[in-house]
Curated annotation (Swiss-Prot):
The RNAP catalytic core consists of 2 alpha, 1 beta, 1 beta' and 1 omega subunit. When a sigma factor is associated with the core the holoenzyme is formed, which can initiate transcription. One of its GO terms (biological process) is DNA-templated transcription. It comes from the Bacteria. PANTHER family: DNA-DIRECTED RNA POLYMERASE I SUBUNIT 2 (PTHR20856). It catalyses: RNA(n) + a ribonucleoside 5'-triphosphate = RNA(n+1) + diphosphate. This is DNA-directed RNA polymerase subunit beta. It comes from Serratia proteamaculans (strain 568).
Length: 1342
């Protein structure tokens, strides 16, 4: 493998045995591609905004005299960039402008004569834009739109599995689900009649819908039944014989023909009998007259003489009727063929319970069911039925729905109309009856072929269409009302409904979620999440076990591991690593094609439906050097089952071993050795890891770390190759390679880094350069690390030296004992940034004022504020300190005599305002790192606001000037080259000022042209600089757009540094979580023979019962990696020759059985080897991919190489006594995470606080400054102890005895420590509750 200069700095040793056939796809593509589809112009009009516009336009007036047509649309430029939107708290969006054409037709003239055409561009609201990382900035906060897994449109056949009816009879049903429009259900009842429901309303006999489609009884029976024909010849009854229909029946009479008895009465008719009848070509047999009684006629029979109806279709025949028919000359009688086995008489029975007889009565019946209580008219009934399933405005199956519908009914074509046809409805009924008759299977609704993904773009398009339809109504009104000659398209369109629909979706839809920004992994997983909840999806309460369960079709599409614990389990899933959606929105996963036992590199993406037809081998099947299967029998999956197949039967093979799992689970090393429940916790807890102060790459990883760090967008990645020209903490400048430059540009790329900003979860986002001046860079190299990344690899935690042993009960029940060294070295210190805002409003009594002049506040409290009343940057503050001084006008209240006196002495001021300053919340302390002031337009800016503005302007000017200088330098270097090539001496040039160079003329015409081009570029650069500076200045100095009634907002950012402490929650990557019980002095920790103490002591009992053995293997491998690092460190300290160093490191990389990673250090220069060694001396990072990891034997080899016992266990000594522990202890390096469940955020104590209104008991919870509930069981405990007085206090004065607690407070102040308990308020509530039930209850006095 070829490594770039940056990648050579640290190479992960990979234990993977299988070569990577397919690179890991870009992990955010599901979001970005979907949104791109939504906003890009689509000439076909299949999806996105274009499709929405085409579906609603043209809008015609009711009279048809005019119409509004759609021409095209364009998205403007956003006003603010992403960062500015976040700071100002606005939405990152672009204005949508649509070109519309108003066409007015002549009234009297023949149809289609145009009188006037007006075209105009109309503003249609703002469309939120997606940032390059797949998020949206809505009102200043980053949000993610989660993809939804919903039931695909189409037709589904299902059964109730015998649960509905007490008899346990299985009732079948069919459901036609459109993309939008009414649902149509067909279902059997326990009596085997077929019913229909529209939109899950009251059920009607299914034949009603056929009558509404204008079918007569005769036609209905004709559609669903085969006929049995009887003929009356010579007063005998002959039946036309179809031998196959007799199979399985018992003969009720002798079946004879041509004088030969084929089957005797009472005998079961078998296949042999049928073969005989067919062989002798028997066409008809004589049947006794009684046999026809009870059969059902297939059509109406009318007396030809009188015209009287003898027998209507679907009537049962009796002997009398037969005689009547015979008399009136009907010698040929058609009846329905039914039997109990596989030709049920369901439709015939249903026609009998159907109250309607013709189309009109059927339509009226449907109207009554849909609109109960409204009087039906013929027109209304017809319109309603027509609009239900046959109108393109109201009903749409969509391309997906039509494809699924036609596939289900086994039709050849997969395209067709979006509305239903008669045939569609009849074929669905036929298939349902077929399933009831035992032909065909019901669908599995949890199969991923029946569930599809709805991503951002599609949901946004649907919302946009909803807005457009609202506008359509208004436009129709306007077109009918107004004077069209003076109206323009702009007057027709009101953009409000559209913006409202879009805003509602992005702001408050259930699937638009506040982004989980704890660390890069949590961001990426949130964007790849797939939810079955949300509008049009399931609800938690109704989702049963089956929907939540892992389905065989999840393989390679949805992760079987990563899902939340709790009520949402299985409803919220994560996309597998290689999965993507196809054009219809179904999930598909890649496979390698296998031909005649040879595995090729051709890759096909298969959806769940397609996959069912193939035999697919696993990724870990053994192949020889040619790529053929080694074994004759290969373990494969086929039709959802796993079994052995011969190698010639195999069609496909998995692409990779980590194809099954999601990104989160693919980061767990030795996942294959963990129990699934613990792996689930491990995958979920990695998302809660807080970025530490200094990120530390995992010694034992899986090789996915780099992909996650780069794709998450938290790192700065080189857009083009080049050389680092400038680097500091906040910007990196690259001189681009000649071959990657565009014609006529300066060839300089500038990357501005994010410094100490707040994330959604209040963690700290900070980027730090990881490249140096002069280094060569290739496209895609990581230039700067973000939070939780280390040299471009994801680094969520720290490598800790752990020992598995008990230690004085401090690791009982998963507690964790931590060494003080971890705190001293700041290994788990994290920075949390809080944003506190102070809003100054315009009140009825006058405006609130931000000022340092606050009544009744001492000098000390104001010491950290400047003269504008805003805290200084850099001030250290603690709970209760004032951050922004603010006073609110106070209404004139009745003054107390004391106040009157004060007022008389000191004058007005003190009393007419009250202090409403912004203070630091209780329990928080930290450093102020930033302050921002937003002032409404037209409100005078205070001194601090002007200072901040001045600073921002300076910074902007400095940034742009530096940018200009860098670009100029690059340009002048090229001008210099052209001049020297054109014959100007370099020495003379150096004496001439740079800006005079462009005045020189060259004799060489080509060079002169080049020089002129460069001169143009120089002028362009300068004018560009001026424009940018001007725009920046305008943005910074303009007033802010604040909410109504708000004059000023001051935002203060407070950084809190949190060290690890007892009560914090920590975890490994294998679901091994625990709480820190004690921080132990270094000298008390167990140490090894070299005197190295361990960092963390874990309980060995946490492993066996939980079956997450991966942690032990990780510990051993981590120890080996550290040992090798130690050896490299020794060699560096002894200044050994580079050749020896190279040989040792090469040996480490080559170790392992048929490992597929090849690192050839002979291609590295000595400097590169030394730099690699420097980065490896703290431990050699190792990758052990999921399901393809290091074997036990390889771990032992590595341990040996690092000079560590192959048992992985060493002798430890007690730090307190120095005595050796009895047994050897497993010691090694485990990657530990600090989770965002910090004790500082949970610790809470209440003094006097707020009380609940009804019960007068203290509120609960930290946010309400609430108390601890002393519940029923706690009361029992006090009763059991007989602690009567304590109990009385708890139930009265400490809770809801209002007078008692006030008096108690007063007593304590007076130094009188007695209490007089009274009546608890909740007792009164109980009395009132009982009285409300109509029972009078009174308390009797003593």
């Amino acid at each position: 493998m070829v490594y770039s200069y940056t990648e050579k700095k640290r190479i992960r040793k990979d234990f993977g045995k299988r070569p990577q056939v397919l690179d890991i796809p870009y992990l955010l593509s599901i979001q970005l591609d979907s949104f791109q589809k939504f906003i890009e112009q689509d000439p076909e009009g299949q999806h996105g905004l274009e499709a929405a516009f085409r579906s609603v336009f043209p809008i015609q007036s009711y009279s048809g005299n005019s119409e509004l047509q759609y021409v095209s649309y364009r998205l403007g430029e956003p006003v603010f960039d992403v960062k500015e939107c976040q700071i100002r708290g606005v939405t990152f969006s672009a204005p949508l402008r649509v070109k519309l054409r108003l066409v007015i037709y002549e009234r009297e003239a023949p149809e289609g004569t145009v009188k006037d055409i007006k075209e105009q561009e109309v503003y249609m609201g703002e469309i939120p834009l997606m940032t390059e990382n797949g998020t949206f900035v809505i009102n200043g906060t980053e949000r993610v739109i989660v993809s939804q897994l919903h039931r695909s449109p189409g037709v589904f056949f299902d059964s109730d599995k015998g649960k509905t009816h007490s008899s346990g009879k299985v009732l079948y049903n069919a459901r036609i689900i459109p993309y939008r429009g009414s649902w149509l259900d067909f279902e059997f009842d326990p009596k085997d009649n077929l019913f229909v429901r529209i939109d899950r309303r009251r059920k009607l006999p299914a034949t009603i819908i056929l009558r509404a489609l204008n079918y007569t009884t005769e036609q209905i029976l004709d559609l669903f039944f085969a006929k049995v024909v009887y003929e009356i010849r010579d007063n005998k009854l002959q039946m036309e014989l179809v031998p196959e229909r007799l199979r399985g029946e018992t003969a009720s009479f002798d079946i004879e023909a041509n004088g030969k008895i084929y089957i005797e009465k009472g005998r079961r008719i078998t296949a042999r009998h049928i073969r005989q009848l067919e062989k002798d070509e028997i066409q008809s047999i004589e049947v006794p007259v009684e046999y026809i009684a009870g059969k059902v006629v297939a059509k109406d029979y009318i007396d030809t003489n009188t015209g009287e109806l003898i027998c209507a279709a679907n009537m049962e025949l009796s002997l009398d009727l037969l005689a009547k028919l015979s008399q009136s000359g009907h010698k040929r009688i058609e009846t329905l063929f039914t039997n109990d086995l596989d030709h049920g008489a369901y439709i015939s029975e249903t026609v009998r319970v159907d109250p309607t007889s013709d189309r009109l009565s059927a339509l009226v019946e449907i109207y009554r069911m849909m609109r109960p209580g409204e009087p039906p008219t013929r027109e209304a009934a017809e319109n309603l039925f027509e609009n239900l399933f046959f109108s393109e405005d109201r009903y749409d199956l969509s391309a997906v729905g039509r494809m699924k519908f036609n596939r289900s009914l086994l039709r050849d074509e997969i395209e067709g109309s979006g509305i239903l046809s008669k045939d569609d409805i009849i074929e669905v009924m036929k298939k349902l009856i077929g399933i009831r008759n035992g032909k065909g299977e019901v669908d599995d609704i949890d199969h991923l072929g029946n569930r599809r993904i709805r991503s951002v773009g599609e949901m946004a398009e649907n919302q946009f269409r909803v807005g457009l339809v609202r506008v359509e109504r208004a436009v129709k009104e306007r077109l009918s009302l107004g004077d069209l000659d003076t109206l323009m398209p702009q007057d027709m369109i009101n953009a409000k409904p559209i913006s409202a629909a879009v805003k509602e979706f992005f702001g408050s839809s259930q699937l638009s979620q506040f982004m989980d920004q704890n660390n890069p992994l949590s961001e990426i997983t949130h964007k790849r999440r797939i939810s079955a909840l949300g509008p049009g999806g399931l609800t938690r309460e109704r989702a049963g076990f089956e929907v939540r369960d892992v389905h065989p079709t999840h393989y390679g599409r949805v992760c079987p591991i990563e899902t939340p614990e709790g009520p949402n389990i299985g409803l919220i899933n994560s996309l597998s690593v290689y999965a993507q959606t196809n054009e219809y929105g179904f999930l598909e996963t890649p496979y390698r094609r296998v031909r005649d036992g040879l595995v090729t590199d051709e890759i096909n993406y298969l959806s769940a439906i397609e996959e069912g037809n193939f035999v697919i081998a696993q990724a870990n099947s053994n192949l020889d050097d040619d790529g053929r299967f080694v074994e004759d029998l290969v373990t494969c999956r086929s039709k959802g089952e796993s079994s052995l197949f011969s190698r010639d039967q195999v069609d496909y093979m998995d692409v990779s071993t980590q194809q099954v799992v999601s990104v989160g689970a693919s980061l767990i090393p030795f996942l294959e050795h963990d129990d699934a429940n613990r792996a689930l916790m491990g995958a979920n807890m990695q998302r809660q890891a807080v970025p530490t102060l200094r990120a530390d790459k995992p010694l034992v990883g899986t090789g996915m770390e780099r992909a996650v760090a780069v794709d998450s967008g938290v790192t700065a990645v080189a857009r083009r190759g080049g050389v680092i020209q400038y680097v500091d903490a906040s910007r990196i400048v690259i001189k681009v390679n000649e071959d990657e430059m565009l014609a006529g540009e300066a060839g300089i790329d500038i990357y501005n880094l994010t410094k100490y900003t707040r994330s959604n979860q209040n963690t700290c986002i900070n980027q730090m350069p990881c490249v140096n001046l002069g280094e060569p860079i290739e496209r895609g190299d990581v230039l700067a690390d973000g939070p939780s990344t280390d040299l471009g690899e994801l680094a969520l935690g720290q490598n800790m030296r752990v020992a598995f042993m008990p230690w004085n009960g401090y690791n009982f029940e998963d507690s964790i004992l931590v060494s003080e060294r971890v705190v001293q070295e700041d290994r788990f210190t994290t920075i949390h940034i809080q944003e506190l805002a102070c809003v100054s409003r315009d009140t009825k009594l006058g405006p609130e004022e931000i000022t340092a002049d606050i009544p009744n506040v001492g000098e000390a409290a104001l010491s950290k504020l400047d003269e504008s009343g805003i805290v200084y940057i850099g001030a250290e503050v603690t709970g209760g300190d004032i951050l922004v001084g603010k006073v609110t006008p106070k209404g004139e209240t009745q003054l107390t005599p004391e106040e009157k006196l004060l007022r008389a002495i000191f004058g007005e001021k003190a009393s007419d305002v009250k202090d409403s300053s912004l203070r630091v919340p209780n329990g928080v302390s930290g450093t102020i790192i930033d302050v921002q002031v937003f002032t409404r337009d037209g409100v005078e800016k205070d001194k601090r606001a002007l200072e901040i503005e001045e600073m921002q302007l300076k910074q902007a000017k400095k940034d742009l000037t530096e940018e200009l200088q860098i670009l100029e330098a690059g340009l002048f270097a090229r001008i210099h080259a052209v001049l020297v090539a054109g014959g100007v001496e370099a020495e003379k040039l150096s004496k001439l000022p740079r800006d005079r160079w462009l005045e020189l003329g060259l004799t060489d015409e080509e060079k002169q042209n080049q020089l002129e081009q460069l001169a143009e570029q120089y002028d362009e650069l300068k004018s560009d600089f001026e424009k940018k500076l001007d725009a920046k200045r305008r943005k910074i100095t303009q007033g802010d757009d604040l909410a109504p009634g708000v004059l000023k907002i001051v935002k203060v950012y407070l950084a809190v540094k949190r060290q690890i402490q007892p009560g914090d929650k920590m975890a490994g990557r294998h679901g091994n979580k625990g709480v820190i019980s004690k921080i132990n002095p270094i000298e008390d920790m167990p140490y090894d023979e070299n005197g190295t103490p361990v960092d963390i002591v874990l309980n060995p009992l946490g492993v066996p019962s939980r079956m997450n053995i991966g942690q032990i293997l990780e510990t051993h491998l981590g120890m080996a990696a550290k040992g090798i690092g130690e050896k490299i460190n020794q060699m560096l300290k002894q200044h050994q020759e580079v050749a020896k160093l190279r040989e040792f490191i090469q040996k480490a990389y080559d170790l392992g059985d048929d490992v597929c990673q090849k690192v050839d250090l002979n291609t590295f220069t000595d400097d590169e080897v030394l730099r690699l060694a420097e980065n490896l001396k703290k431990g050699m990072p190792i990758a052990t991919p999921v399901f393809d990891g290091a074997k036990e034997s390889e771990i032992k080899q590595l341990l040996e190489m690092g000079g560590i016992p192959t048992s992985g266990q060493i002798t430890l000594f007690d730090g307190r006594t120095g005595e050796q522990f009895e047994r050897q202890v497993t010691v090694g390096y485990m990657y530990m995470l600090k989770l965002n469940h910090l004790v500082d955020d949970k610790m809470h104590a209440r003094s006097t606080g707020s009380y609940s209104l009804v019960t007068q008991q203290p509120l609960g919870g930290k946010a309400q400054f609430g108390g601890q509930r002393f519940g029923e069981m706690e009361v029992w405990a006090l009763e059991a102890y007989g602690a009567a007085y304590t109990l009385q206090e708890m139930l009265t004065v400490k809770s809801d005895d209002v007078n008692g607690r006030t008096k108690m407070y007063k007593n304590i102040v007076d130094g009188d420590h007695r209490m007089e308990p009274g009546m608890p308020e909740s007792f009164n509530v109980l009395l009132k509750e009982i009285r409300s039930l109509g029972i009078n209850i009174e308390l009797e006095g003593e």
